[in-house]
Amino acid sequence: MQGRSFKTICETGREPADWKKAAYYRYWMHLAHHDNPGHLGLRTKDYKLIFYYGLGRDDKTPRTPPGWELYDLKKDPQELVNVYDAPTYASVVTDLKKQLTARRHAIGDDGSDYPEIEAVVQEFWNYDAAARAKAEQISHDFRATMEAPAAAAPKAKKPN
C-alpha cells in the first residue's frame, strides 16, 4: 500500500498542507466472495469516481458490463445516486479522470501486467454511444450466462 501514516490527522483532526487530495484504489477480486465486479477508482473529499471494467485476472469468472459511476459525496454520502451522466458534472468527470490517470501512473499501474483488463479500460474510457451499446450487450450476455444453470436445473416435484 502506498502512502504515509495518518495517525497525526486522527490525533489532531488537521491535515498537513502537503496531504494528498485524492486516493486511488483497485478492486481485483472480480465476482469473488461477494459478487462485486472488478473496478478501479479515485476518491477525493467531495467525489468518488469508479470504473467497473468487469474482468477477472483469469477466465474463471464471467465478464460483466464496463461502466462508470460518479458520486457527489457532499450531497450523497451514501453513494445512492450516480451522477456520471449529469451535464452539471461533466467538468468534474473530466478532472477526476485526469487525476485517476495521474495516480495510476504515479504508482506504476500502467496496465501492462494485465493487458486484457487495460484494453477494456481504454476501450470504455470515453464511454460514448458505441461503448454504451457494447456494455449493454455484455450485460445481456452476462444475464444469459447466469440464468443458464438455473434453467437447466431439474424442476422440483410438487407435493401430492
Residue ranges and their predicted role:
Residues 29, 50, 72:
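A contiguous binding-surface segment within folded domains or other stable secondary-structure elements
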